[in-house]
Swiss-Prot record:
Name of the featured protein: Polypeptide N-acetylgalactosaminyltransferase 11
Domain-level remarks: There are two conserved domains in the glycosyltransferase region: the N-terminal domain (domain A, also called GT1 motif), which is probably involved in manganese coordination and substrate binding and the C-terminal domain (domain B, also called Gal/GalNAc-T motif), which is probably involved in catalytic reaction and UDP-Gal binding.
Record: glycosylation sites: 29, 202, 508
Subunit and interaction comment: Interacts with notch1.
Bilayer topology annotation: Single-pass type II membrane protein
Organism: Xenopus tropicalis
Region (Catalytic subdomain A): 143-254
C-alpha cells in the first residue's frame, strides 16, 4: 500500500514538473512581454532575407552586448519590414543595467545609439529613396573600377562593419576593385584583434586594412588610403554610412565621360538616436564667410531639364565626407593639403580647387548614401588645437585672394595666427593655372553676398515656404492605467521647462488634453512638447518648445501600454502610485502597472 502511494506521489511530481516546464516554455517563447522585442532583428552575418508575413525572429539578448557573437553564425534573419524599411522604434528599449551601460557608453564614445547599432547587426535593408526615374536609367557596361577608401578612428565596431557590408552587398563585383580601411591609430580594443579576426574569417580579400602608426587625422588618413589604392576611381566614404541601391554606377558614369568631374551622392539621413534611415531633400553645397559648409536649395535652372530631379547638377562645394574622383586626377590636382590637421575646412579647399583649376563638381541624385548625422564630434585633435581655424587660414591664404578679408572681418583674432608653410600649395595653384576666387564667385556661386562699403544688397534667391505641420493622429487625456490619473502640467502648460505630474482627471479642463502626431510628439494643450534630456536620463520629463527633430521628443506607445521614449530607451513610470504628488520619471522598461499608459479619446 505504501509502495503504491509512493509511486502515485512520484508520478504526480513528474506530471507537475512536465506541466510547469511546458507552461514556462510557452510563456518565454510566445508571450509579448517576455520577448520584449517582437520586431528586433537578430544579429548575424547573412544578408537581409525577409521573413514570411507576421513571423518575426525572437530577440537574442546576446546581441545587447558590444558584439559578443559576431562570428558564431547567428542565422542573420531580419525583421519583416514595411515598404519604407523603417525600424521598430522599440529597438532601443532598455531592459537591464547592461543595456543602459551600452547605450550610455555609446553616446559618450560615438555620439549615437550604440545599443541599437549592435542589435541591428551588420546587414539590413534600407528604403530606396531615389527619384522614380533613377530606376529606369541604364549605364555603360565598361564603367571604371572603384577603390572605396574608408578612414576611421575609434569607430563603433558594428557601424564600421555595417558600412563595409553595405558596400559589399549593394555594389556590383565587376565595379568594386577594393575596399581600403584606414585605421587612424584607434585606441578601442575591438578595432584591433577583433577586427583582424573578423576580416580574416568573414570578408572578401578585396577588403584591405591599413593601420597608421600615429594619429594622422581624416585628411592625411585619406591620403594614406589613396596612396594604397589601385582602382581607376577613388570613392571616399565615412565610417558610419550605408550605401543605397545602385549607388555606384551613377557616380562612375560622369567620371567615365569626363575624368575631371568630381561627383557626390545625395547624403540621406540616418538618425543618431534611432538609426532609422530617411530620405534627404535634394540640395547643393554652399558656404558662409566664416568658412563653414552649409546646404542651399538648388536653383530651378539646374533642374529644368527633361530628367528633372534625377539629373546631376552643379554644386559650389561638397560636404566632404562622401565623394568620388578619378584617381589620376586626384593626384594631379594635389590630393589634399597635407599641412591641414585632423578635420575641418578640407572640403571647401578641395571644392574651390576643383572649380578654379578646370574641373567640375556635381551632385548626383540617383546615387544615395545614408550617413549617421551626429550632434557632436566624439573626438578632438590630439593636442586640443583648433584645427578648423588652422585649416581655414591655410585655405583663405592660398585660394581666396582679396576675399580672405571677408573671413577676417568675422574672425579678426586669427589675422596674425600662424598657419604653417603654404609655399607648396601656392606653387600648385600656379602650376595648375587656376582662376581667381572672383571668377569662382561670379561664375559658380553668384548667390554669395559680399559685405563691405561697395557691396550691393541682393534680394533673396530662394523662398522659404515653411515647414508643413505634422498630422495629428489622436487627441485625448494621457491616463496612467494603475491609478486612472491624468498626466498634466505641474504648473501652467505654457511654462517651458515645467514638470509633468499625474493628477485627478478633469474632463472639463482642456489643458489636460494631449495631441499625438505622426512625428511621435506628445503636445500638451497645443503648446509644448513632452521632452527628455538625451544626456541625463535620470532627469524627469519636461515640457519644452517643439523642435521637430525627433529624438528627445519622440514617444512611442507600445503594445503592452508602455510609453517608450526613443532617445533614452526607457519607459515613462509613475514613481509612487500611492503618493498624491504624482511624480513621474523614466525607468528601465519592465511592463509593470506603473508603466502602463493610455491616450484616451
Amino acid at each position: 500500500m505504501g509502495s503504491a502511494a509512493l509511486r502515485c506521489f512520484c508520478y504526480g511530481c513528474l506530471f507537475t514538473s512536465v506541466t510547469w516546464t511546458l507552461l514556462l516554455f510557452i510563456y518565454f517563447n510566445f508571450s509579448e512581454e517576455s520577448q520584449g522585442f517582437r520586431h528586433v532583428p537578430v544579429k548575424g552575418l547573412e544578408p537581409y532575407k525577409p521573413l514570411p508575413k507576421k513571423i518575426y525572429p525572437r530577440f537574442s539578448r546576446d546581441s545587447m552586448g558590444q558584439h559578443s557573437d559576431p562570428r558564431k553564425g547567428h542565422n542573420g534573419n531580419q525583421l519583416e519590414t514595411e515598404a519604407n524599411a523603417d525600424l521598430s522604434p522599440e529597438l532601443g528599449m532598455i531592459f537591464n543595467e547592461q543595456d543602459q551601460d551600452v547605450r550610455d557608453v555609446g553616446y559618450q564614445k560615438h555620439a549615437f545609439n550604440l545599443l541599437i547599432s549592435n542589435r541591428l547587426g551588420y546587414h539590413r535593408d534600407v528604403p530606396d529613396t531615389r527619384d522614380s526615374k533613377c530606376a529606369k536609367k541604364t549605364y555603360p557596361p565598361d564603367l571604371p573600377m572603384a577603390s572605396i577608401v574608408i578612414c576611421f578612428y575609434n569607430e563603433a565596431f558594428s557601424a564600421l562593419l555595417r558600412t563595409v557590408h553595405s558596400v559589399l552587398d549593394r555594389t556590383p563585383a565587376q565595379l568594386l576593385h577594393e575596399i581600403i580601411l584606414v585605421d587612424d591609430n584607434s585606441e578601442l580594443d575591438d578595432l584591433k584583434k577583433d577586427l583582424d579576426g573578423y576580416m580574416q574569417e568573414n570578408l572578401s580579400k578585396k577588403v584591405k586594412l591599413v593601420r597608421n602608426k600615429q594619429r594622422e587625422g581624416l585628411i592625411r588618413g585619406r591620403m594614406v588610403g589613396a596612396s594604397h589604392a589601385t582602382g581607376d576611381v577613388l570613392v571616399f566614404l565615412d565610417s558610419h554610412c550605408e550605401v543605397n541601391e545602385m549607388w555606384l554606377q551613377p557616380l562612375l558614369a560622369p567620371i567615365k565621360e569626363n575624368p575631371r568631374t568630381v561627383v557626390c551622392p545625395v547624403i540621406d539621413i540616418i538618425s543618431a538616436d534611432t538609426l532609422i534611415y530617411s530620405s534627404s531633400p535634394v540640395v547643393r553645397g554652399g558656404f558662409n564667410w566664416g568658412l563653414h559648409f552649409k546646404w542651399d536649395p538648388v536653383p530651378l535652372a539646374e533642374l529644368g531639364g527633361p530628367e528633372g530631379f534625377s539629373a546631376p547638377f552643379r554644386s559650389p562645394t561638397m560636404a566632404g565626407g562622401l565623394f568620388a574622383m578619378d584617381r589620376e586626377y586626384f593626384n594631379m590636382l594635389g590630393q589634399y593639403d597635407s599641412g591641414m590637421d585632423i578635420w575641418g575646412g578640407e572640403n571647401l579647399e578641395i571644392s574651390f580647387r576643383i572649380w578654379m583649376c578646370g574641373g567640375s563638381l556635381l551632385i548626383v541624385p540617383c546615387s544615395r548614401v545614408g550617413h549617421i548625422f551626429r550632434k557632436r564630434r566624439p573626438y578632438g585633435s590630439p593636442g586640443g588645437h583648433d584645427t578648423m581655424a588652422h585649416n581655414s587660414l591655410r585655405l583663405a591664404h592660398v585660394w581666396m585672394d582679396e576675399y580672405k578679408d571677408q573671413y577676417f572681418a568675422l574672425r579678426p583674432e586669427l589675422r596674425n595666427r600662424d598657419f604653417g608653410d603654404i609655399r607648396e600649395r601656392l606653387a600648385l595653384r600656379r602650376r595648375l593655372n587656376c582662376k581667381s576666387f572672383k571668377w569662382y564667385l561670379d561664375n559658380i556661386y553668384p548667390e554669395m553676398q559680399v559685405s563691405g562699403p561697395n557691396a550691393k544688397p541682393q534680394p533673396p534667391v530662394f523662398m522659404n515656404k515653411g515647414q508643413k505641420r505634422p498630422k495629428i493622429l489622436q487627441r485625448g487625456r494621457l491616463i496612467n492605467m494603475q491609478t486612472n490619473r491624468c498626466l498634466v502640467a505641474q504648473g501652467h502648460p505654457s511654462q517651458k521647462g515645467g514638470l509633468v505630474v499625474a493628477k485627478e482627471c478633469d474632463y472639463n479642463d482642456s489643458e489636460q488634453v494631449w495631441s499625438y502626431n505622426e512625428e511621435h510628439e506628445l503636445i500638451l494643450s497645443n503648446l509644448l512638447c513632452l521632452d527628455m534630456s538625451e544626456t541625463r536620463s535620470s532627469d524627469p520629463p519636461r515640457l519644452m518648445k517643439c523642435h521637430g527633430s525627433g529624438g528627445s521628443q519622440q514617444w512611442v506607445f507600445g503594445k503592452s501600454n508602455r510609453l517608450y521614449q526613443v532617445s533614452v530607451g526607457q519607459c515613462l513610470k509613475l514613481v509612487d502610485p500611492m503618493s498624491r504628488k504624482g511624480y513621474v520619471s523614466m525607468a528601465i522598461c519592465d511592463g509593470s502597472p506603473s508603466q502602463q499608459w493610455h491616450l484616451e479619446n
